[in-house]
């Protein structure tokens, strides 16, 4: 497993932005900034949290996919030897560890969905996974917002927001506030 520096993560995000520009890049930067700040206050490695935040959506470098960005990001980072970042790319959209709560299109094959589900089941989440899940739930492309505002925005755009996922986000917020 390779250690990922902030500089390397920024270069990877910049390359991804050239391949597939969009608001997801600024969102990733805000996730990273929030993760770094919260990590520093909670006794976690702020630099590690920042790099993981930068790369949580790195699968978007391959296009504008929905769940495909999770699958693609995980495999891309694994190939590069960044297991921790790959795990975060995998877990960031699934705060309950299940595909059932995914908000968006299932734009991968049934076979890839099964692989993704198995990877999620095997993932051993830690505070960095939880932190990026929280920061993903408070960061937009325009900055950090109240968690309820962000979840309502997603609900407006997709037409629903699973209650179980909503409740877990509130739980994560409380976890890092304590």
Task: Enumerate the predicted regions with their spans.
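Amphipathic alpha-helices of TPR/Sel1-like and other helical repeat/solenoid scaffolds
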Residues: 31-35
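Non-catalytic interface/linker regions that flank or bridge core catalytic/transmembrane domains
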Residues: 1-2, 161
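Divalent metal-dependent catalytic cores for phosphoryl transfer on phosphate-bearing substrates
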Residues: 14-17, 41-154
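Acidic-glycine-rich active-site phosphate/pyrophosphate-binding loop
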Residues: 2-9, 48
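Generic N-terminal amphipathic, Lys/Arg-enriched alpha-helix
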Residues: 6-21
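Charged phosphate-binding loop/patch that engages nucleotide di/tri-phosphates or the phosphate backbone
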Residues: 157-178
């Amino acid at each position: 497993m390779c250690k990922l520096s902030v500089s390397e993560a920024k270069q990877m995000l910049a390359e991804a932005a050239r391949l597939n520009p969009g608001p997801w890049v600024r969102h990733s930067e805000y996730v990273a900034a929030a993760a770094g700040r919260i990590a520093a206050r909670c006794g976690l490695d702020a630099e590690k949290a920042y790099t993981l935040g930068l790369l949580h959506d790195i699968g978007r470098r391959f296009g504008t996919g929905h769940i495909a960005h999770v699958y693609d990001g995980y495999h891309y980072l694994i190939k590069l030897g960044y297991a921790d970042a790959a795990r975060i790319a995998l877990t960031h959209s699934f705060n309950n560890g299940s595909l059932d709560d995914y908000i968006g299109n299932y734009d991968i094959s049934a076979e890839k969905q099964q692989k993704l589900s198995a990877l999620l089941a095997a993932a051993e989440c830690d505070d960095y996974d939880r932190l990026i899940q929280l920061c993903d739930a408070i960061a937009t492309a325009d900055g950090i917002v109240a968690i309820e505002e962000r979840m309502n925005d997603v609900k407006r755009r997709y037409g629903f927001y699973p209650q179980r996922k909503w409740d877990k986000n509130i739980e994560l917020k409380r976890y890092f506030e304590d």
